C-alpha cells in the first residue's frame, strides 16, 4: 500500500468509521459507519412505525362504522327522538355514532328544523369525523417523501468526506502518494447505506399511507350514505 494510503491516517473520522465496519459488520457498526445523517432516518422510522400502529388501532371498523349501528339508531327512534342518555350512548359508540347523534340533537333542539338544517348539521359533523379519520396521515406522507431525501443527503455528505480524505492524501489512484481505490470503493458503499436506509423507511411508509387513505375514503363513503339515509328518517320524525 502507498505510504499516503488510508490506513496510515487513522485519525480521520471517515476512516475510523470504515474500520468499525470492517471489524464488526453488524447493524450498530453500519449505523456508526454511516455517520450522523442516519440518525434523522432512524427517528423517522420510529415515528413512522408509531403512526402506523396508532392508525391500525384507531381505524378499526368497530370504532368507525359498526355494521348495525344505523339500523339500531333508526329502530330506537321510530316513535320519536330518543332521550339524552340514548343519544349520549350513541355518540360514544363510534365516529358514525357522533354523526347520527348530531342529527338527533338538531331535531331535539328544533323540532321544526328544515331539511337543509338537518343536512347542514350532519355535514358539519361529517367534516369533523373526516378530520379525525385523516389525523396523522399527513405526517406519514411527509415521512414517505422526506426519508429518501434524507438518505440522499447522508450519502452526499459521506462521499464528500471520503473524497475529501482522499484528496488530503495527495490524490487518488495507485500512484505513489495516492489514495487506495479499494478503500475508496468501500467508503462509497458505506455512504450509500444512507440512501438504502432512506428507501427502507420510505417504501413501507408510502405503502401504509396509501392503504390508510383508501381505508379512510371507504369509511367516508359509508358514512355519507348512512347520513343521507338518516336525514330522510329524521325528516319523517319531524312531520
Predicted feature residues:
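Short, strongly hydrophobic alpha-helical membrane anchors
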Residues: 7-33, 170-180
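Hydrophobic membrane-targeting segments
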Residues: 21-70
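Residue-level signature of catalytic and energy-coupling elements of molecular machines
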Residues: 35, 49, 84-85, 100, ...
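Predominantly long cytosolic amphipathic alpha-helical stalk/bundle segments
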Residues: 64-153, 157-176, 208-239
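Pore-lining and gate-forming transmembrane alpha-helices of multi-pass membrane transport proteins
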Residues: 182-209, 213
Amino acid at each position: 500500500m502507498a505510504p499516503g494510503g488510508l490506513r496510515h491516517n487513522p485519525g480521520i473520522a471517515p476512516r475510523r468509521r470504515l474500520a468499525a465496519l470492517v471489524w464488526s459488520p453488524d447493524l450498530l457498526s453500519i449505523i456508526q459507519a454511516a455517520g450522523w445523517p442516519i440518525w434523522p432516518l432512524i427517528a423517522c422510522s420510529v415515528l413512522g412505525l408509531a403512526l402506523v400502529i396508532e392508525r391500525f388501532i384507531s381505524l378499526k371498523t368497530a370504532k368507525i362504522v359498526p355494521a348495525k349501528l344505523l339500523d339500531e339508531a333508526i329502530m330506537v327512534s321510530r316513535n320519536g327522538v330518543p332521550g339524552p342518555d340514548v343519544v349520549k350512548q350513541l355518540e360514544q359508540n363510534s365516529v358514525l355514532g357522533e354523526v347520527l347523534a348530531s342529527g338527533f340533537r338538531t331535531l331535539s333542539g328544533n323540532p321544526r328544523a328544515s331539511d337543509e338544517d338537518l343536512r347542514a348539521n350532519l355535514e358539519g359533523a361529517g367534516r369533523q369525523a373526516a378530520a379525525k379519520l385523516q389525523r396523522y396521515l399527513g405526517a406519514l406522507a411527509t415521512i414517505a417523501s422526506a426519508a429518501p431525501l434524507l438518505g440522499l443527503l447522508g450519502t452526499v455528505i459521506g462521499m464528500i468526506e471520503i473524497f475529501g480524505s482522499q484528496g488530503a492524501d495527495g490524490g487518488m489512484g495507485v500512484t505513489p502518494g495516492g489514495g487506495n481505490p479499494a478503500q475508496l470503493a468501500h467508503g462509497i458503499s458505506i455512504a450509500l447505506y444512507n440512501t438504502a436506509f432512506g428507501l427502507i423507511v420510505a417504501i413501507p411508509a408510502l405503502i401504509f399511507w396509501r392503504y390508510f387513505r383508501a381505508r379512510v375514503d371507504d369509511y367516508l363513503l359509508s358514512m355519507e350514505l348512512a347520513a343521507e339515509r338518516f336525514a330522510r328518517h329524521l325528516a319523517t320524525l319531524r312531520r
